[in-house]
Regions:
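Membrane-interface helix-boundary motifs at transmembrane edges
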Residues: 30-39, 113-125, 197-209, 267-275, ...
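A conserved hydrophobic secondary-structure block that centers on an alpha-helix together
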Residues: 11-22, 28, 32, 95-227, ...
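Soluble non-transmembrane domains of integral membrane proteins
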Residues: 518-610
Length: 650
């Protein structure tokens, strides 16, 4: 009975989404307040229906209702209950329902927290989000219904959740990543609503900016969690593989970063209006493209869902309608929102525009490297592979000027500035950056490489100018310590975001240039030295888990004769799915990780063991967290609410 109720609620939600996409929009066109006022209750009803339907699917997993085909294919009675809950979004149908649930959450949030906006603006925004929800609900109901029964025959037990997904990271990574993905629908809806109204001003940017910051924050955290999961779960010792589906989340992040900075210019200076609208359309379009890539069945990826071509065709139609319709509207009405605001080449506007162009160029590089192999294969031209060297080379070339502009930009004045005013800062920053970039690799790793110096120069340049920015703002009217307390959340958010970029680049630089990897055969008692650390293999013991059995390799690590860590690398056999998995052992620290992965037992009784020394690898994720915190600070800045109150009072 519960699955049938879930089906009914999805049908009801589709009906509400259709009403939400029609009535408020019609009311806004006719200035009928009665029709526009329907937007908020319809949005709340949509959220309630999808929310309850999702809880019913979770309930089916928790109680092991194997009459539901999706549950039987992705769960098992021996699966721990928390993984049963995570299995709800572990495959195509459930993850798509999660996608729509989070879309309804964003729709509900806009309905609740936009009460100071004009009613016609809210009506248009919610109507656009209703259209998106309606399209995806149709997709679920016709091709991907998670409530489909397997009657009259159904299995006594389920196939089990993919062992790769039986990890604590998979409980949090997909929902947070999807919150970012779907969150850009709000920026998209604001952009389309503004085009429909023919009005795009600083108020539009101020309304849209906190929602964009929230979406960007969630997407940043989702990417960080996914990278960390790949690092410790896949057993390869890497944190980013330029996998097509990883790229599908990275592209909207790049465009979203450009959008955040462009919104700042539109809000404060009234310029970049048409460009900002185009970025909002592009960010959400890339989110839809990522959804298509994951579910089309055309990609080989550890992240891709096994899917039939009809599903990919349905999403492709949605993609064409959404992108084509929005670009057509932009072509028809984009000219009306353009604004001419004069500024010189040496101005903050020019620096932000330059960084926007570099971010879009980086996105196009990733898009080309992701889609070209797929297009090449579909055209019958054979298989080609675009790998890490291409992406790394192109990104380094683009990110060097990006870091240059990112560091200096916040210290440049709006509209125009004097180059001579910055000469002293430029000389100091250049000398400190160059000195530290040469000294740190030698002090920490005993050798210097050209790529390490380039990477550290990029990071330290951004970091030094971020500190200069804090000092200048704090001492503008007060003493330094008193001035720190006067900085706004938005200013702290910008500094945290830029420092986060620097910290991430430091982590990438050291881990890419100074990591050490060894693949060895080891018997109990064998040892090997890796970068000042002595690894001793103490054999393998049997272990048993809730739904798996396996072996645990014990590796003692010492440094200068003193115990440093004991690594317990596992090899697990999942009985339900009959799959063997590797669980890496990691001893983490602020400046280094020691990493071990247990391979197969060899014929002579020895074991294949992979050992890594990875310096500063965690800084990659620390920087991502700092960036997300920066987004949170900006999002919570009360100045937006204060401005609205002042406008209303006047």
């Amino acid at each position: 009975m519960m699955p049938e109720l879930g089906n009914f609620l999805l049908c009801l939600a589709a009906g509400l989404a259709l009403l939400l996409s029609v009535y408020p929009l019609w009311g806004a066109a006719r200035q009928d307040r009665r029709l526009m006022a329907l937007a908020r209750p319809l949005a709340c009803g949509l959220f309630a229906c999808i929310g309850v339907a999702f809880l019913l699917l979770v309930h089916a997993f928790v109680v092991n209702d194997f009459t539901v085909r999706y549950v039987a294919e992705n769960s098992n009675s021996a699966l721990p209950v928390w993984y049963r809950v995570a299995a709800t979004w572990g495959a195509h149908e459930g993850s798509l329902l999660l996608w729509v649930l989070l879309l309804s959450v964003w729709t509900f949030a806009v309905a609740i927290f936009s009460r100071r906006m004009p009613l016609d603006a809210v009506a248009r925004v919610l109507a656009v989000m209703g259209m998106i929800a309606f399209g995806f609900l149709l997709f679920i109901l016709f091709t991907s219904n998670p409530f489909s029964r397997g009657l009259p025959q159904y299995p006594i037990d389920g196939r089990d959740l993919n062992p790769l997904l039986q990890d604590i990271g998979m409980i949090f990574h997909p929902p947070i990543l999807y919150m970012g993905y779907v969150g850009f629908s709000v920026a998209f809806a604001f952009a389309i609503a503004s085009l429909l109204a023919g009005r795009l001003d600083t108020a539009w940017a101020r309304w849209s900016r906190p929602w964009t910051q929230a979406a960007w924050m969630f997407l940043t955290l989702g990417i960080v969690l996914g990278s960390a999961w790949a690092y410790y779960e896949l057993g390869w010792g890497g944190w980013w593989f330029w996998d097509p589906v990883e790229n599908a989340s990275f592209m909207p992040w790049l465009v979203g970063t450009a959008l955040l900075h462009s919104l700042a210019v539109t809000e404060k200076r009234g310029s970049f209006r048409a460009w900002t609208v185009l970025l909002a359309i592009a960010a959400f379009s890339l989110c839809l493209l990522g959804t298509f890539l994951v579910r089309s069945g055309g990609l080989v990826s550890v992240h891709a869902f096994a899917s039939d071509p009809s599903r990919g065709l349905f999403i492709l139609v949605l993609l064409i309608v959404a992108i084509g319709g929005s670009l057509l509207l932009y072509a028809l009405k984009g000219g009306r929102v353009r604004a001419r605001v004069e500024h010189t080449l040496w101005s903050r506007e020019s620096f932000l525009l330059g960084n926007n162009i570099l971010l879009m160029a980086a996105m196009l590089v990733v898009l080309l490297g992701t889609l070209l192999p797929l297009v090449h294969k579909e055209l019958g031209l054979g298989s080609i592979s675009i790998g890490e060297p291409f992406f790394n080379t192109m990104f380094t070339a683009l990110m060097a000027p990006f870091a240059l502009l990112l560091g200096l930009g916040p210290l440049i004045r709006w509209r125009r500035d004097d180059v001579a005013r910055q000469i002293k800062r430029l000389i100091i920053a250049l000398l400190v950056t160059l000195s530290l970039s040469l000294a740190l690799p030698w002090l920490l790793q005993d050798r210097i490489t050209a790529m390490a110096v380039i990477g550290l120069m990029m990071a330290l340049w951004v970091l030094i100018f971020a500190l200069m920015e804090v000092h200048e703002r704090a001492t503008h009217r007060h003493g330094f310590w008193r001035g720190l307390r006067t900085l706004t959340r938005s200013q702290w958010g910008m500094v945290l975001g830029h420092v986060g970029v620097a910290v991430t680049v430091i982590g990438i630089t050291f881990s890419q240039n100074y990591s050490v990897e060894r693949d060895v055969r080891m018997r109990p008692g064998d040892s090997i030295d890796i970068h000042r650390y002595h690894f001793v293999f103490n054999g393998v013991r049997n272990i048993v888990g809730p739904n798996w059995t396996g072996g645990e390799g014990i590796i003692a690590v010492t440094r200068n004769g003193r115990p440093e860590a004991t690594l317990y690398a596992e090899k697990r056999f999942y009985t339900a799915s009959r799959m063997m998995m590797t669980e890496a052992a990691i001893s983490g620290g602020l400046t280094r990780d020691l990493y071990a992965a247990l391979g197969e037992e060899l014929s002579d009784g020895s074991w294949a063991v992979r050992l890594y020394y990875k310096p500063f690898v965690r800084w990659i994720w620390y920087g991502g967290v700092l960036m997300a915190l920066g987004g949170l600070c900006c999002m919570l800045d009360p100045r937006y609410r204060m401005r609205k109150k002042l406008q209303e009072a006047s």
